[in-house]
Regions:
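Hydrophobic "anchor" residues
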Residues: 9-10
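C-terminal binding/interaction regions
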Residues: 39-110
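A short glycine/serine-rich beta->alpha loop
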Residues: 14-22, 54-59
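Short beta-strand scaffold segments in enzyme catalytic cores
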Residues: 1-5
Length: 110
């Protein structure tokens, strides 16, 4: 995954696997969390997601899991702006707004 920030910085992330499943983390969250830690005041402009299998790009587009979608919803709330998500496959790329991936996200109301 790659996060493009509003200032032009690109932050990369990859899957972090762990034998103590489900302790690993998806590439999307790795990149978004790193961007939030390293550039806390810079909004996200876009997030690109791609995957390979045995060194080759997947033919199908890659869609984020529910946990990643929730994190995206919280990034939108944090900065007050939506961002593009590019789901990349070998044969096509789908571009969609992050807000449309999880229309009924959890929200802290405490």
């Amino acid at each position: 995954a790659a996060v493009l920030l509003e200032n032009g910085t690109i932050v990369l992330g990859n899957n972090q696997e762990n034998v103590a499943y489900p302790s690993g983390m998806c590439a999307e969250r790795t990149a978004l969390f790193y961007a939030g830690a390293a550039y806390p005041d810079v909004p996200v402009k876009a997030l690109a997601i791609a995957a390979c299998f045995k060194g080759r790009p997947r033919k199908e587009v890659v869609s984020p899991c529910g946990a990643c979608r929730q994190v995206m919803a919280e990034v939108i709330r944090r900065y007050g702006r939506d961002f593009d998500v590019l789901m990349i496959g070998e044969e096509e790329t789908v571009v969609i707004k992050a807000s449309s991936l999880l229309p009924f996200s959890f929200e802290y109301t405490g």
